[in-house]
C-alpha cells in the first residue's frame, strides 16, 4: 500500500536565547531562530510533508511543555498570525516550509483566563484536552512553550478538512526568566588555580536562580562542583565560589572544563577552560631559575678563592665622651725596661735585686705594633726600688756620668732627649720582688725622700727638671694598663714638676758642693743598701 502522509520537522527552533516580549513593550517580538542559525547564516524553524504532493494548509500554535499538551495562553505574533496562532496555505512547489516571522508574545497573569477562553472559542486544541482541564490556570508554565505544527489536506471538495497528526517541537524557553534562561558564563576573574582547590573565583553570568544553579568542573568521567551558598549568588548575575580539588596530584598544568548547570532541567552553559596547577609554592618556576647548582657554586668559590667567604672586619669605633668630642688616645709611655736618667739602663731586675736573679721571670707580651716607652722624666720620678739612694749605691760614679746627654745649645728650644729602651717588668708572680714594696703594699713605687733627691748631682737635676717641664702635661694624660702604676704620689716632687719654677730649683742646689763629695756622702750614709743579705732575708 501507499504510505500515509505525515509531518516531519526539518529544523527545530532554538530552545534558548529568545526573550518573550509583552504586548505593552510596543515592539516586535522578533523571530524564532532555528537551532542551526548563526549570525552569518540565519535559519528558522522548518517542516516538510512527506508522502504527499499538493496544496496544504499549515497551522502553528503554542502548547504547554508537558503532557497533556494544552493550548498555551501566550500568543504567536508576526506575519499570517491572528488570535494568537499562525495559519497559511502552501502550494505543491514548496517541499520545505519555513516560518521566518514567528514571534512569541507573553500575556500577563491577569489575562490568562481571557486568553484560554479565546483558544477554546477558536477551537485551538490540537490534542483535544478536556475543557475543564484548560481552565486550571495554576498548571501553566509561563516561561516555556512548544510549537505545535498541524497540516490540513484538501478533500474532494477542496476544503482543508483532512488533518494530519499534530507534531510538537522542542521546548522554547524565555530567556528573560531566571529559571529557564540560557546559561552563559560572561567572565571570570581567574582561569587557573591550585590542584588542591580552594581558590576563590568571581564569575559573572546571565540571570540565574540562586537555588537552582551549580558550577561544574568536568574532565572525561571526572566531575566536581564548586563550593558556594545561596548568599554567594549576587543579584542573579554573579557567583562567588571556591574551586574543588582535582582528581589526583599533578606535575604539570592540566586543563578541564568549567560550566554552569541548572539541576531542575539539567541545562548547562557553554564550557570555559580552567587550568589546574601543580602543588608548588613557585608554580611558574621562578625559584628554580634563581637557584644555582652545586657545581656552579663550587666553581665560583674556586675562581674567587677564599676571599668569597671572608668578610672584612669592621673598623673600631672611636671613643666618644658624653659631650660628643673624640678622646685622643695617648701612647703608653712606660718602657718595658727600667731606665733612669743619668743612671744608665738596667737590663733586668737582677741588676737591681741580686736576690731575685735566681727566680724565673716572664717578660710581658706586647702587641706587634705597640712599643710602650717611658719618658725619661717619668722614669726618673718613678722607680720600683725602695729608695733612690739604694740604687745609687749599686753603681759607680762613672756609670752615672757616662750616659748623661749633653744639654742643647744655649737658646735652643729643644730639650734634652733620652733614648728609651724596653722595660722588662718583673713577673706578676715574683713574690720576692713585691716583698720589697712593704710600704706601698705592692701597689706602687716607694717614695724618695727629699734628702735623697738633693744628693743627686746638679747636672742630673738640671737635666731631670728640663725633662719634667717638657712633659708635665703628657704625664697627667698618660694611659697605662699596668696595675703597678695606678698609685703615684707626687707630693714630694711638686717643686720638681712645676715647669715655671724649674730655674729656681737650680739655685737651691749649693754650687760649691763638689759633685764627687755629694755622691760619696750619699753612698757612705747607707752602707747596707746593696748588701745581698738584705734581699736574701726575704
From Swiss-Prot:
Q: Which residues carry this modification: Phosphoserine?
A: 264
> Can you tell me where the transmembrane regions are?
none
Region annotated Disordered, chain positions: 401-422
Q: Where is this motif: Nuclear localization signal?
A: 287-292
Q: Which residues form the RHD domain?
A: 5-294
Which molecular function GO terms apply here? Answer: DNA-binding transcription factor activity, RNA polymerase II-specific; RNA polymerase II cis-regulatory region sequence-specific DNA binding
Please tell me one Gene Ontology term that the record gives under cellular component.
Answer: cytoplasm
Per UniProt, the keywords (alphabetical) are:
DNA-binding, Nucleus, Phosphoprotein, Proto-oncogene
Please tell me where this protein is predominantly located. nucleus
- Kindly list the biological process annotations in GO that this record carries: canonical NF-kappaB signal transduction; cellular response to stress; inflammatory response; innate immune response; non-canonical NF-kappaB signal transduction; positive regulation of transcription by RNA polymerase II; response to cytokine
Kindly give the Gene3D superfamilies that the UniProt entry links to this protein.
Immunoglobulins, Rel homology domain (RHD), DNA-binding domain
Q: What does this protein do?
A: Proto-oncogene that may play a role in differentiation and lymphopoiesis. NF-kappa-B is a pleiotropic transcription factor which is present in almost all cell types and is involved in many biological processed such as inflammation, immunity, differentiation, cell growth, tumorigenesis and apoptosis. NF-kappa-B is a homo- or heterodimeric complex formed by the Rel-like domain-containing proteins RELA/p65, RELB, NFKB1/p105, NFKB1/p50, REL and NFKB2/p52.
Assembly mode: Homodimer; component of the NF-kappa-B c-Rel-c-Rel complex. Component of the NF-KAPPA-B p65-c-Rel complex.
Q: What is this protein called?
A: Proto-oncogene c-Rel
State the organism named in the record. Answer: Meleagris gallopavo
